[in-house]
Amino acid sequence: MTEFVTSADGTRIAYDVEGSGPPVILVGGAMQFRAFDPITSEMAQHLAGHGFAVVNYDRRGRGESPADAPITLAQTIDDLRALTDELTEGADDAVALFGNSSGASIALAAAAAGLPVSRLVFFEAPLDEEGGEDGAVFLAELRERIAAGDRVGTLEAYMSDMPPEWLEGAKQSPGWSTMLEIAPSLEPDAESLAWTQSGPRAELWRDISTHGGPPVEDLARSAWPVAQNGTATG
């Protein structure tokens, strides 16, 4: 059942909770929200079955969490703080954050901003170099497209460093209209990715253990020589 929490600026954030136990918040990436991403909902149910209270939420500007542009990383972190307060009943207890794709950089930024986080878990975190010095060019171009109301251009700018066939496939897919609708909500994704390029990497990555291949493995090793790497089966 959908519940709502009110963020610092009054925006209502829609979410579901599955199970009970230590709290885990699932932070979606670029195109993810509950009605558009059944796989994350399935994962929430799976984790709940292993003794966790799992929050799957619609990020600001998506699904049942409507908001006007511009949508900032700071606002997105405020939304996570509101969810955390709701889960812990204001006790400031720590929560685990699972970040998928660019949701990983948002989760990392939230932890760096002081959100009480017990664990950070990333899946396919795109934390390699973004275009332009410190990601600034990438972010500036996206913001320019959003400010102009150019939703097609926003998606094209965001996907500019991805294989061209991914963008063409998206344009031909039934979900393209939904992607256009939520395009302004990509700004926090871009802002957080740019932030990872300008932050103190050794501090950000020193406690990271990676499971799988690049880019996270390479980035962690370059930032902190004792970073661990492992591969999980299944």
Predicted regions and their residues:
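Conserved HGGG/HGGXW glycine-rich cap/lid loop of the alpha/beta-hydrolase fold
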Residues: 4-66
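Short amphipathic alpha-helical segments and helix-helix/interface helices
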Residues: 41-45, 84, 143, 183, ...
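Conserved hydrolase catalytic core segment
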Residues: 92-131
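Conserved serine/cysteine hydrolase catalytic core
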Residues: 175-221, 227-228, 232-234
